[in-house]
């Protein structure tokens, strides 16, 4: 709705702007909570069996986005609680203006998720339906299209207005890392993160497996002893969980792709990964998809799986994700823009359609991380104000949920 895609910004040339850094963005006011940077109507299935119906409904409503995810595979109460936490977070995310929840059975799970989402975001238009109650998939698609159409009408007149950047929550992610990630891409994102935090905003990064070997550095940046203890604890828990099944985190990290890109050990990879969080104190450690409510820099305890980790922070309430890659990744997200940053000139040339910003000038000595970090910050604010990220323009709307426990 009113979004435009800027082709090749930061990819074809070094910008290095000198104008003042923006301290406001254009977003959508919500009746409760933070403003959004998108005005999405999402069609959210609450179980895997409702995915197709959700997709067919979304296809009939211009601008609607279906949010299918990796199968529900719930294997116990703890796992079910985690899945519900992600779905509730998605339904109450700041970029979501309205929600249609689609259930398979008439068991009330959709109503439970709607109720919890409304506790977080009172006044949000949310409708629920079940395929069983409608009398089957064909009738459900017809009824869902009517419900979704009404929701689309309810949010159609929303207009952007100015807000301070202190309202923004930026997420950071890396995937398909190579040597250039730690040398340039992640440091540039770190500069951008520091700028936003200094303007009163919030930054969250995750992927606990990729803090291993660098957790002591993050712990030294903790705002207090309890936060430092939690940082050490979540990394130790990952290794303990791997050992319990006869594996080690280092056994799968770095990946073959990481090693082909010049990374030799998990410690080397982690030292580069944590740079995307900038240099400010760590305020706390959040559980998977836990709401991000504080200011400053936060860590979230997630696996290293890119789609899962991005979705967790989106469900936690982040507005957008800045994703660094050296080997290349097309990944997007259903409820937030995912901006791609790459410092590998060969990868940028090969996959230019998938990138928003090139940090390759740092590698070639044409720019500094500080100057490019400011440019990235400006681009981030443009995306927050409506410019489409590459993944959005292409239509990458991935979403995934982490599952725990043993399948029945």
Task: Show which residues each predicted segment covers.
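Metallocofactor- and cofactor-centric catalytic cores in central/energy metabolism, strongly enriched
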Residues: 2-320, 324, 329, 333-408
């Amino acid at each position: 709705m009113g979004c435009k895609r800027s082709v090749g910004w930061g990819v074809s040339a070094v910008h290095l702007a000198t104008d003042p850094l923006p301290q406001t963005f254009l977003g959508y006011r919500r009746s409760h909570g933070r403003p959004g940077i998108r005005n999405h109507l999402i069609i959210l299935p609450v179980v895997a069996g409702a995915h197709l119906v959700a997709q067919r409904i979304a296809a009939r409503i211009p601008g609607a986005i279906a949010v299918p995810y990796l199968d529900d595979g719930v294997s116990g109460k703890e796992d079910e609680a985690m899945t519900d936490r992600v779905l509730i977070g998605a339904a109450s995310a700041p970029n979501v203006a309205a929600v249609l929840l689609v259930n398979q059975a008439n068991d009330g799970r959709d109503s439970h998720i709607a109720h919890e989402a409304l506790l977080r975001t009172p006044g949000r238009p949310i409708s629920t339906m079940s395929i069983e109650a409608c009398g089957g998939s064909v009738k459900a698609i017809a009824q869902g299209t009517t419900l979704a159409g009404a929701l689309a009408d309810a949010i159609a007149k929303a207009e952007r207005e100015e807000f301070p950047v202190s309202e923004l929550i930026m997420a950071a992610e890396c995937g398909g890392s190579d040597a250039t990630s730690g040398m340039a891409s992640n440091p540039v994102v770190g500069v951008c993160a520091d700028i936003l935090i200094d303007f009163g905003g919030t930054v969250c990064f995750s992927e606990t497996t990729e803090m291993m070997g660098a957790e002591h550095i993050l712990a030294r940046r903790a705002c207090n002893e309890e936060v430092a203890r939690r940082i050490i604890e979540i990394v130790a828990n990952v290794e303990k969980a791997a050992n319990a099944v006869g594996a080690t985190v280092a056994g799968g990290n770095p990946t073959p792709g990481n090693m082909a890109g010049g990374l030799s050990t998990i410690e080397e990879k982690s030292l580069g990964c944590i740079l995307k969080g900038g240099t400010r104190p760590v305020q706390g450690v959040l559980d998977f998809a836990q709401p991000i409510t504080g200011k400053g820099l936060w860590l979230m305890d997630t696996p290293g799986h890119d789609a899962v980790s991005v979705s967790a922070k989106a469900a936690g309430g982040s507005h957008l994700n800045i994703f660094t890659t050296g080997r290349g990744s097309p990944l997007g997200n259903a409820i937030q823009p995912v901006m791609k940053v790459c410092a590998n000139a060969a990868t940028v040339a090969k996959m230019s359609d998938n990138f928003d910003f090139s940090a390759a000038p740092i590698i070639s000595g044409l720019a500094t991380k500080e100057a490019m970090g400011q440019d990235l910050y400006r681009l981030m604010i443009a995306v927050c104000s409506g410019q489409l990220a590459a993944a959005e323009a292409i239509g990458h709307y991935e979403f995934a949920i982490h599952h725990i426990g043993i399948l029945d």
